[in-house]
Amino acid sequence: MSDGPIAPPKPAVVAEAHEVDTFHVPKAFFDKHPSGPHLKNLDEYKKLYEESIRSPDVFWARKARELLTFDKDFQTTRIGSLENGDVAWFPEGRLNASFNCVDRHAIKNPNKVAIIYEADEPNEGRTITYGELLREVSRVAWVLKQRGVKKGDTVAIYLPMIPEAIIAFLACSRIGAVHSVVFAGFSSDSLRDRVLDAGSKVVITTDEGKRGGKVIGTKRIVDEGLKQCPDVSTVLVYKRTGAEVPWTEGRDIWWHEEVEKYPAYIAPDSVNSEDPLFLLYTSGSTGKPKGVMHTTAGYLLGAAMTGKYVFDIHDDDRYFCGGDVGWITGHTYVVYAPLLLGCSTVVFESTPAYPDFSRYWDVIEKHKVTQFYVAPTALRLLKRAGDHHIHHKMEHLRVLGSVGEPIAAEVWKWYFEKVGKEEAHICDTYWQTETGSNVITPLAGVTPTKPGSASLPFFGIEPAIIDPVSGEEISGNDVEGVLAFKQPWPSMARTVWGAHKRYMDTYLNVYKGYYFTGDGAGRDHEGYYWIRGRVDDVVNVSGHRLSTAEIEAALIEHPMVAEAAVVGIADELTGQAVNAFVSLKEGNETNDQVRKDLILQVRKSIGPFAAPKAVFVVDDLPKTRSGKIMRRILRKILSGEEDSLGDISTLSDPSVVERIIATVHASRGK
């Protein structure tokens, strides 16, 4: 006899794991493979992963010696801890990044193609061999040295996607200088802030850039930004279009004229494993961009390891990452991973829609690309454009990667079926500027995948799901919380340039003894990870992390604005879109021109990619009695969740919520 009604089964916490199929590695992946993946199967991954967590010092020492060439070997694998924020890897070792990326391949096979340059206009590109790359890198290194750049100095790079960007990276690292790349879509103000923060005395740029058929006045932007940077003594200018540009005698020098003065070889300077390799500025929740600092050996090892095992790179491969060198994706997977592993890397100057929506597929077919890595934003755009643009076989493609944000299941399936012809393995990767390389990801040829999930942790990565309320780790499967990591790994950022306390407070002091990602995540019933997105005040637009505080600061600079609040909401094309709420100072009236001016203000202050998609002018913002703006309420209103705003009685003026809802409805024509 029953003891009473049987309780209904408890719904799954990570419900989407039960709504998708699991995809095994396509048989065609192995059929078209020249030699087979680096790992035999999932069991081999599990065995190596277990070793990387239980015996990290043994594991990483072996892999470092296997994948990198050290001038002086190390005795210690790792010192320091997450708790103290003083982690260091291979501390006695010495090496050079440029040697590891160029010389060792140039010595073995100087005629092998290192860079496949796909220019903005189709058929205007060129290839550069490893031998040629060594000569070009050496000459630019000489130029930098003659202009007074010493080991440890920072060099700002403001270049579009041209081979000279890679050459500039490697020329800096060849002489032990620290490259600080500023995305060539950033405004003159953003460039100025980054040059000043890094203390760069040399800036490398072009006369102009070309992208999607449009010309970008890079030198003009640099000149404007440097008006308030008196310490910059050299601007090295590569002639991309031949346009006439303003010139400051004594400071500005032409790349093509300078490189002719110097020899085609300069010996690489040996640096310590922990010497800085580069700074990369990322948006922080406080608004002030932070210069994330990566060091040499650990970062290079992370790039080489993930290139080898995630993307299954072999030295005859032709690897195409669609990311820009102004972001971490371009650093790690356009430049360092492919060149460390000695394959050919595609440098793509254009856009996926220029001159038409078949551009990516044309490039893949033309260059017999074997691995392709791009953001879901581009995939959504191309899916929407229609499958008739995909008219190539692209039969060499083995791996299709996704980066920057979670990829929706329907886009994943389209990528697999239409682009990969059900023959390529999809790798939906999760990582950050601060992690340096992929941290949760499938391994090509090895990991069964689920559309929408980043799959399983990479070697050395021990994820923890943390309860944000109690701060305690949640064990077991089918759980959700915030994502943290329990162990250090070689490619993690070491500090924020000139602000170690900020580094500690952002990543290591939130949950003591853990690295805090700032992202929410679920671990499903089979241990697969599903990334939920930011839990702090950062908006992810087209894979670019933007600080809401930084955008708010730009809006408040406008003389009419009293207060501003910025939130990110879901957007079909860009993943998230920036929406801004502003209240105006007394005496100012709302009109369309004000909204246009505010969007322009953000474009000028930060860059076009940060511009709000919508600006709502309201009489006040929802604030607590202590004055804190409740962005959560604004997010819910924009998402149509007005019936689940929660308790608004704690607001200093609860009636403001109804007025904001009315403004949003009126703007949307409801």
UniProtKB/Swiss-Prot annotation:
GO terms for cellular component: cytosol; extracellular region; nucleus. Belongs to the ATP-dependent AMP-binding enzyme family. InterPro entries: Ac_CoA_lig, ACAS_N, AMP-bd_C, AMP-bd_C_sf, AMP-binding_CS, AMP-dep_synth/lig_dom, ANL_N_sf. ATP binds at G404, E405, P406, D428, T429, Y430, W431, Q432, T433, D519, R534, R545. One of its GO terms (biological process) is acetyl-CoA biosynthetic process. This is Acetyl-coenzyme A synthetase. It is an enzyme of class 6 (ligase). Induction: By acetate. CoA binds at R211, G212, G213, K214, T329, S542, R603. The keyword Membrane does not apply. Its EC number is 6.2.1.1. SUPFAM superfamilies: Acetyl-CoA synthetase-like. It catalyses: acetate + ATP + CoA = acetyl-CoA + AMP + diphosphate. GO terms for molecular function: acetate-CoA ligase activity; AMP binding; ATP binding. The gene is facA. Keywords: ATP-binding, Ligase, Nucleotide-binding.
